[in-house]
């Protein structure tokens, strides 16, 4: 089947010469099409840290399947290793002034930016809604659990859990 697809008039990608896959060129093209970096031993995307590389392997397979015939899993593993080198960034520090949410980014000063323009360390699967009503059940639970003066302390602690810092304002 692969022999039928190796015709001279076919528009082959730069990384495929008709018989071999150039992993470095494949990774360059892949990084032009997809926002992803590699830092601190992990891949990061606009959705946050990639904890399972199976979807990434699937994307690579989808691009390779028309030209790779032998040892496809090993070829994908090799490409992932080259991708780590190609996408490597020297420093990817945490952003301490923002919380990335499913529909955008909430800055600690209260401003909200919609969309996912940047590669981030983490993104919570919760949508920001500035018009949300008070969480009555949660507040009743806290009222039954703590003294009224202790509730702000717990809320502040939970807030610190959402940002990569333990410094106060």
Tell where the protein language model's regions lie, with residue ranges:
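Short, small/acidic-rich helices and loops at N termini and domain boundaries
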Residues: 1-10, 42-71
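Generic cytosolic/nucleocytoplasmic N-terminal low-complexity/intrinsically disordered segments
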Residues: 2-5, 10, 28, 33-34, ...
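Extracellular glycan-interacting surfaces
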Residues: 8-17, 70-73, 128, 132, ...
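Extended, Lys/Arg-enriched charged tracts that mediate electrostatic binding to polyanionic substrates
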Residues: 11, 15-21, 25, 69-106
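Phosphate-interacting basic helix/loop segments used at nucleotide- and nucleic-acid interfaces
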Residues: 16-34, 147-153
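Residues that form generic nucleotide/phosphate-binding pockets
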Residues: 29-30, 59, 63-67, 79-82, ...
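P-loop NTPase catalytic core of nucleic-acid-dependent motor ATPases
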Residues: 34-55, 99-100, 105-169
């Amino acid at each position: 089947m692969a022999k039928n697809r190796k015709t001279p008039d076919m528009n082959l990608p730069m990384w495929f010469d008709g018989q071999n896959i150039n992993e470095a060129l494949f990774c360059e093209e892949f990084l032009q099409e997809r926002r992803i970096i590699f830092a601190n031993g992990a891949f990061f995307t606009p959705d946050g840290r990639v904890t399972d590389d199976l979807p990434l392997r699937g994307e690579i397979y989808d691009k390779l399947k028309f030209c790779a015939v032998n040892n496809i899993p090993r070829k994908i593993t090799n490409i992932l290793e080259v991708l780590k080198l190609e996408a490597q960034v020297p420093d990817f520090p945490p952003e301490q002034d923002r919380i990335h949410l499913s529909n955008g980014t909430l800055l600690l000063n209260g401003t909200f930016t919609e969309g996912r323009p940047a590669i981030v360390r983490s993104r919570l699967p919760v949508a920001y809604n500035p018009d949300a009503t008070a969480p009555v059940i949660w507040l009743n639970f806290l009222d039954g659990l703590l003294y009224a003066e202790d509730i702000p302390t717990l809320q502040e602690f939970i807030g610190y859990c959402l940002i990569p810092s333990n410094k106060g304002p």
